């Protein structure tokens, strides 16, 4: 279909960009309510770049744990005073593996997923995968247990009751090595594809593992049935048991079920934790952008939001869940991810796809040949691309999505992320930080020279996510890995999310010419997000912890605003026990009514 332009370019430019693109004014661009935001209290610096990936929090000790893959350790940080986070100790994982990927905490027990490097045959260079481990330790960093899991443990999660730990074993393909370490061998026939796994570790009431993990695989699933349903199984020569790559874990409120993203497969796995067994795998489908807005090119020289008949493959990274009126919903950050190895790659620019026999319209085919339109947009030669091509696909959905637990979309904000940033952050729109620069401040400054650089790929790239309950309301906090910053949505109604705020202190500081000394102002590439409820918080106020991969910083935010104040006030009013005076009962009931009435009025006004 012909793109419909809904944007008007102007000469407005804010910030210190050396490459000034025109600001984009969207007639119906989303505007946040302004009643909820994030206030940075303090930032922990991991001691160098690339030293903060995933963050966890333990309410019992008021300590957070930050995975540091660069140094293969977990930093335990005291945040009893969030304005002054203090390193307690660093837990070295080198004795147990070669890289720490995920970390979780519950009731004084911490666990990290640690991968082990593969070995390579000296004659052929063929790789043999080595399963990783889950390392248990306490708030002082004392290691208690090391439990074997699957290959390449990634996300780690506790069940809410603390009796299970679930570990996603990604089991990524391994190309053979050329010259024993001199690079990847291009021959796909020499590659190996380890099994993807989900490990379930049972714990006693003190958080001590009972024994070995139940390492679950996908052998019971029929590969062709899954493919027919839309699950992307396509590594040459692999079936479901090897091809599926568990990425991120969330566990239901009743601790009975785990939901695990299978990012490259664009699917969700469902795990019965009581059995335990993987009971289902369902495909997520694609997102139609024909009536949404996106910039599809990094070569058009401007912010150019248009709608195209392109489908986004959700391919979520992080996932969380929440329950409303007894119904569980999943919330995903739709990053998108391709397989791109020396021995196999599915990546292709739309201009380079083979359109022989294609049923696409002449206008769309012409757009794919133009680098300023669709030609630069990254796509796939694998599923769901057909031969001949009848539909165009791109990585990710540039959004978050709320799903029912049978795979139906309940809510997605469409193109609101991209529309809002185009209008309010035009000098950093779809920017990319130069990760080869020596300081976080220089990386942030480089984004002003890299405007539009990610438009041909995944846009702002939503990757991290957490859901939190504050009073009677639920909020989603979504981290944009490339664009930076956190999107905040009220998702109390799972079918109708409300945009509350976008917080990007690093870009705000750069635009203002600041020195990046205040908390949160030198964060680059947010990866992990953790919500801390008011009841668990050392300040008795809800917090959001955000770990930033490139800058190596982790910032502690307080969730603030008029709506939050009203919710906390309403939820803190407790009616006196039976036998109290009628006057006190009337007073307490009145306070509760006033608080709720004020909250309702604010919501209606918004």
Locate the predicted segments by residue.
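Beta-sheet-rich non-transmembrane sensory/scaffold domains
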Residues: 27-565
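C-terminal low-complexity, Ser/Thr- and acidic/Pro-rich disordered "stalk" regions positioned immediately N-terminal
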Residues: 561-578
């Amino acid at each position: 279909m012909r793109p419909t332009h809904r944007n008007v370019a102007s000469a407005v430019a804010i910030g210190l960009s050396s490459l000034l693109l025109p600001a984009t004014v969207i007639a119906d661009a989303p505007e946040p309510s302004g009643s909820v935001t994030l206030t940075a209290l303090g930032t922990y610096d991991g001691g160098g770049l690339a030293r903060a990936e995933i963050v966890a929090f333990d309410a019992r000790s008021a300590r957070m744990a930050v995975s540091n893959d660069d140094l293969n350790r977990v930093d335990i940080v005291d945040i009893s005073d969030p304005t002054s986070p203090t390193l307690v100790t660093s837990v070295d994982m080198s004795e147990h593996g070669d890289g720490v990927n995920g970390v979780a905490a519950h009731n004084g027990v911490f666990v990290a997923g640690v991968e082990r490097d593969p070995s390579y045959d000296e004659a052929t260079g063929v790789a043999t995968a080595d399963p990783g481990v889950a390392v248990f330790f306490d708030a002082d960093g004392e290691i208690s247990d090391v439990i074997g899991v699957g290959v390449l443990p990634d996300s780690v999660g506790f069940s809410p009751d603390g009796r299970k730990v679930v570990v996603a074993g990604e089991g990524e393909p391994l190309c053979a090595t050329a010259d024993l370490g001199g690079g990847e061998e291009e021959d796909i026939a020499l590659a190996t594809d380890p099994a993807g796994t989900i490990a379930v570790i049972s714990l006693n009431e003190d958080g001590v593992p009972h024994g070995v993990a139940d390492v679950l695989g996908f052998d019971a699933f029929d590969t062709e049935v899954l493919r027919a349903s839309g699950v992307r199984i396509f590594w040459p020569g692999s079936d479901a048991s090897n091809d599926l790559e568990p990425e991120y874990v969330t566990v239901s409120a009743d601790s009975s079920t785990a939901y695990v993203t299978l990012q490259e497969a664009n699917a969700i796995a469902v795990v019965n934790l009581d059995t335990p067994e993987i009971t289902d795998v369902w495909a997520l489908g694609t997102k139609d952008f024909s009536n949404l807005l996106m910039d599809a090119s990094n070569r058009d020289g401007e912010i150019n939001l248009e709608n195209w008949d392109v489908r986004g493959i959700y391919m979520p990274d992080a996932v969380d869940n929440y329950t409303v009126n007894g119904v569980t919903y999943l919330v995903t950050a739709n990053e998108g991810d391709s397989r791109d190895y020396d021995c196999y790659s599915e990546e292709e620019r739309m201009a380079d796809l083979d359109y022989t026999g294609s049923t696409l319209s002449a206008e769309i085919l012409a757009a794919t040949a133009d680098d300023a339109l669709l030609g630069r947009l990254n796509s796939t030669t694998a599923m769901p691309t057909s031969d001949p091509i009848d539909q165009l696909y791109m990585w990710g959905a540039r959004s978050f999505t709320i799903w029912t637990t049978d795979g139906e979309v309940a809510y997605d904000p469409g193109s609101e992320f991209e529309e809002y940033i185009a209008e309010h952050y035009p000098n950093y729109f779809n920017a990319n930080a130069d990760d080869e620069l020596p300081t976080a401040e220089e990386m942030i400054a480089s984004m002003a020279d890299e405007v539009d650089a990610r438009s041909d790929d995944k846009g702002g790239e939503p990757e991290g996510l957490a859901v939190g309950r504050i009073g009677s309301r639920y909020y989603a906090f979504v981290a944009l890995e490339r664009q930076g910053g956190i999107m905040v949505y009220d998702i109390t109604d799972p079918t109708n999310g409300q945009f509350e705020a976008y917080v990007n202190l690093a870009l705000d500081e750069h635009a203002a010419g600041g020195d990046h000394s205040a908390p949160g102002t030198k964060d680059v590439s947010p990866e992990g997000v953790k919500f801390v409820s008011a009841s668990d918080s050392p300040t008795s106020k809800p917090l959001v912890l955000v770990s930033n991969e490139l800058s190596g910083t982790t910032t502690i935010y307080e969730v603030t605003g008029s709506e939050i104040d009203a919710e906390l006030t309403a939820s803190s009013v407790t009616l006196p026990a039976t036998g109290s005076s009628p006057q006190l009962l009337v007073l307490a009931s009145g306070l509760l009514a006033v608080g709720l009435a004020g909250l309702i009025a604010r919501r209606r006004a918004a």
